[in-house]
A protein has these predicted regions:
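N-terminal nicking endonuclease/strand-transfer module with a His-rich metal-binding environment
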Residues: 1-134
């Protein structure tokens, strides 16, 4: 069963995205996907969405980590599960970058998504009750 945690990113958004998309962690970036942005420029797109919607909050993005038990899933299946989670909780309303890490004893997904809904301009409301425990 996957364990999911989420926390806010209030600064260094570019460094967080750079970290999760590192080649050595993501099987040479094969296990990196994104929605409404390109991973290498996602931090710029996130900030543009904030500016376009005149958002003033301190949270720039959210970092969701989805961890699997050793041997529970293979890297491709973990990435697919991460995409399903993004569709379920973000509903194609938030730009995101998904990276599946395979450099540790357990496979895990990192999802960094914009705190601002690119359609409505409203900020994401974090609610642990909506995060599934796959």
């Amino acid at each position: 069963m996957a364990i999911t945690k989420i926390h806010p990113i209030k600064s260094t958004l570019n460094l967080a995205i750079d970290y999760i998309t590192k080649s050595e962690k993501t099987d040479e970036k094969i296990l990196v996907s994104s929605f409404k942005c390109h991973p290498s420029t996602a931090h710029i797109q996130f900030m543009k969405t904030r500016e376009d919607n005149d958002t003033k909050g301190t949270v720039l993005a959210r970092h969701l980590i989805q961890s699997f038990l050793p041997g529970e899933v293979d890297p491709i299946k973990a990435h697919e599960i991460g995409m399903e989670l993004c569709k379920k909780i973000l509903k194609e309303d938030y730009e995101f970058v998904l990276a599946t890490h395979v450099d540790r004893g357990h496979i895990h997904n990192h999802i960094i998504f914009n705190n601002v809904n690119y359609k409505t301009g409203k900020c994401y409301q974090s609610n642990k009750k909506i995060l599934p425990q796959n």
